């Protein structure tokens, strides 16, 4: 099974907390976890905004993307976005989350997030939460 890591899960990996996220990631075969280019964009934006520890965080993010492939957003993702946006007409939902959901659906992977509620009701989207203590 392949997994797409939501932005919050990537942040947990970078911060090395909570430990259960790191443990679950460690159980996967190489290449089983991927990141959407949308999550990478969110991480880059966060890095640009902050001033403290900038050089260190640049290195950590570079290490993360060297180990977790960043998938490009394709026409298939755009088509999935249209379907999901039409299915869930709540325009208050975050567009970035909708793009990540569409990307996961279009690539046939399970989305890993700690924000389950943000991704409910999207048709065809499979979600797991590795941050829960189980």
Q: How would you describe each model-predicted region?
A:
Residues 1, 101, 105-134:
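Acidic, PIN/NYN-like endoribonuclease modules and their adjacent C-terminal/linker elements
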Residues 1-35, 47-63, 133-134:
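Short, well-structured N-terminal submotif of metal-dependent ribonuclease cores
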Residues 6-7, 21, 43, 81, ...:
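Generic structural signal for small/hydrophobic residues in well-ordered secondary structure
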Residues 9-10, 39, 77, 100, ...:
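Alpha-helix capping/helix-boundary segments
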Residues 33-40, 114:
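Substrate-recognition element of Asp-dependent hydrolases with the DxDx(T/V) motif
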Residues 64-66, 123:
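Short, structured coil segments at secondary-structure junctions
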Residues 68-112:
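Active-site neighborhoods of divalent-metal-dependent phosphate/nucleic-acid chemistry enzymes
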């Amino acid at each position: 099974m392949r997994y797409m890591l939501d932005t919050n899960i990537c942040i947990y990996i970078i911060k090395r907390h909570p430990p259960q996220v790191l443990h679950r990631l460690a159980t996967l075969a190489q290449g089983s976890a991927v990141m959407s280019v949308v999550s990478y964009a969110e991480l880059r934006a966060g890095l640009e905004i902050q001033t403290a520890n900038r050089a260190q965080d640049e290195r950590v993010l570079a290490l993360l993307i060297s180990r977790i492939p960043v998938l490009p957003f394709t026409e298939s993702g755009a088509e999935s976005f249209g379907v999901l946006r039409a299915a869930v007409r709540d325009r208050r939902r975050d567009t970035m989350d909708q793009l990540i959901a569409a990307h996961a659906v279009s690539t046939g992977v399970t989305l890993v997030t700690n924000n389950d509620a943000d991704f409910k009701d999207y048709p065809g989207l499979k979600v797991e939460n590795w941050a829960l203590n189980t």
